[in-house]
Design a protein with these regions (language model features):
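Hydrophobic, aromatic-enriched alpha-helical segments typical of multi-pass transmembrane helices
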Residues: 1-241
Length: 241
C-alpha cells in the first residue's frame, strides 16, 4: 500500500519546512561541530542547553515520520516509469531514516541521563561520553549517506524519465551527491569538503523536499512520450530503469 499523492506531497512539504525548523533549533542552541568532540565541553553544553537541544531533536524525530511518508509516496510515483530506481529510492531511504532516527531518539533520551550522571559521578559521565558520541556520529553518517543516495536515485529517475520536472531531478542528484560528500570525506585529508558541503546539502534537501512535495500534491506527471494520439508510437520499454 502507498499513501495518496496529496498526503505524500504534503508530507514532503512539511518535511522540508521541518528540516529548516530543526536546523534553526540546533543553530540557536549554541551547538557547533566541535561541541561533542570533548567530553567536558559536551557535558557542560548538555547542562546549560539540554532543554533546547531536546526540542531540536524532537522536531527531528517528527520530521523523520514525514520523510518516511514522503519517500514512500515519491517512490510510488517513480515506480510506473523507473521501477529499479524507484526501489532504490525507497529502500535506501528507509535504511537512511532508520539510521538517522537513532540520533534524535538517542539524544532525546540521553541528554537527561548524562546531565544526571555528570552531577553524581563526573568521571563516569566523561568516560561514557566518548563511546556515546561515536555511536551518534555513526548513526548520523548512516542516515546522511543513505538518504543522500535515495535522493540521488530519485533525481536520476526524474531526469531520465520525466516523472516530475527535470530541474527537480538535477536538484535531487546534486542534493544526494552533496550529502554523500559530507559523509565520505569526513575524517580524511578531504575533510574540508565535508565541512564545506554540510550547509549546502542541508539547504538543497529542504528545497528538494518542498519542491517534490508540491509536485506530488499537484499530481504533475510529465510523460516522455504522449500516448493515445494518432501518429504517436508507444515508447519502448526502458530496460535500464
Amino acid at each position: 500500500m502507498t499513501p495518496r499523492g496529496r498526503i505524500a506531497g504534503l508530507s514532503g512539504i512539511l518535511a522540508g519546512v521541518g528540516l529548516a525548523v530543526e536546523g534553526a533549533l540546533w543553530a540557536t542552541s549554541g551547538w557547533t561541530a566541535d561541541t561533542f568532540g570533548d567530553s567536558a565541553t559536551a557535558l557542560a553544553f548538555l547542562r546549560d542547553h539540554g532543554s533546547h537541544l531536546r526540542a531540536a531533536v524532537l522536531a527531528g524525530a517528527i520530521n523523520l515520520v514525514l520523510v518516511t511518508v514522503f519517500t514512500v509516496g515519491l517512490a510510488a510515483r517513480l515506480a510506473t516509469t523507473a521501477p529499479t530506481r524507484a526501489a532504490a529510492t525507497l529502500y535506501l531511504g528507509i535504511i537512511g531514516i532508520a539510521g538517522h532516527s537513532l540520533v534524535p531518539l538517542g539524544l532525546r533520551l540521553g541528554v537527561p541521563t548524562f546531565v544526571e550522571l555528570a552531577v553524581g559521578d563526573p568521571s563516569a559521565a566523561a568516560a561514557a561520553w566518548s563511546g556515546y558520541a561515536s555511536f551518534q556520529t555513526a548513526a548520523g553518517a548512516v542516515g546522511a549517506l543513505f538518504l543522500g543516495l535515495s535522493t540521488l536515485a530519485a533525481g536520476w529517475a526524474i531526469i531520465s524519465l520525466r516523472a516530475l520536472p527535470v530541474l527537480l531531478g538535477w536538484l535531487g542528484v546534486l542534493t544526494g551527491a552533496a550529502s554523500a560528500v559530507t559523509v565520505l570525506t569526513a575524517e580524511t585529508p578531504l575533510a574540508f569538503l565535508a565541512a564545506g558541503a554540510y550547509l549546502p546539502s542541508l539547504t538543497l534537501a529542504i528545497v528538494f523536499r518542498v519542491w517534490a512535495g508540491i509536485g506530488l500534491w499537484k499530481g504533475e506527471v510529465q510523460p516522455a512520450v504522449e500516448q493515445g494520439r494518432p501518429g504517436h508510437q508507444r515508447p519502448a520499454p526502458n530496460l535500464g530503469s
